[in-house]
Amino acid sequence: MRTKSSALLLLAVLLLLGSCREHDKYFDEAKPPAITAKEFATGLAGPLGLAVDPKGHVWVTEVGTGHNDGKVSVITPNGKVYPVITQFASVISPEGLAAGLGHLVYKDGVLYILNGVDGKLYLADVSSFKPGDAPRPASELRSEDIATFVIAYPFEVDTEFSNLYNLAFGPDGGLYIADAGANAVIRRSPSGQLSVLAAIPGIPNPTPGGTAPIDAVPTGIVYDGEKFLVSTLTGFPFPEGKARIYQVSKEGLVSVYRDGFTALVDIALGPDNRPVVLQFAAPGPQGFAPSSGRITRSTTSQNTVLLEGLNLPAGIARRSLRSYYVTSLADGKVLRVE
């Protein structure tokens, strides 16, 4: 018995040492491990937000073509795509782009889905859904009007606009929403009551002759167990190197976690509980430059680029220790990054 116990103890120690070496390799900021992006799923119509469930299924929002054809699909571990919920509001924005669904989260068999066009939070019980089942129309889902509360709220800097974009669960079961239109974080209590946790400040205008501050445009939110981390896009003209990650306390106090980014569109927590952010693209003379998206790991002292060359990525979700899923809005794909 003692020999068997000793062998098991030795095996546990070896596994622990191997795990530590893997962590050390991953967290080497001076020489981060090389990672690549591979095609995981294709043929999606404007894929944006991602959520991974305990079975390894990937739930993804598709903005659609602007003709009320937004949908939520599920991707099985072998990369097959199945529609789950269809007919979400989708319109053509003043910029000529399709707009509608934002991000989603999965919790205990329920999807929480945001739509910035109709200003609603949708709740879908997918606990019994099996890939291949007939999809449901969005009109059958329970929904809650969030935008009316946001637009009526007397913000100190009031845009009089709402664009529900990203969300995350926080302490006490609250759901926290990054509103890219109002530049704010909205709290929805477990009973559905709404309040404002924090307003996300703009930045000084760095352009010649620019006087009005540039909006923060919060695009991503995560809770690391102590505080919220919020990624920002920054408004037009999307100045290079001016986007930030803000940290927001549970009481709503806002401060800069790290700056020096460009056009951030999503944020995830890495295996060390530090933020990994997604750059949409670098601004160019003709707008955002294709294939200039990147993934960056950030600490309070350093930003480390993990991968470049992504084509207009929009969402990121962690899959495993050093593996992520990323959507490509332009290519209609979900990529596996590892």
Model-identified regions with their sequence ranges:
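Residue position within the beta-strands of beta-propeller blades
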Residues: 59-62, 113-114, 176-178, 229-232, ...
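Post-signal peptide N-terminal segment of mature Sec-exported envelope proteins
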Residues: 28-52, 73
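Beta-rich, blade/repeat-based domains predominating
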Residues: 43-55, 69, 90-110, 150-175, ...
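Flexible "stalk/tail and boundary" regions
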Residues: 23-24, 38, 68-86, 100-111, ...
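Bacterial N-terminal signal peptides that target proteins for export
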Residues: 1-8
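Surface-exposed loop and turn segments in beta-propeller and other repeat-based domains
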Residues: 82-96, 132-159, 194-212, 255
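Bacterial Sec-dependent N-terminal signal peptides
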Residues: 2, 13-38
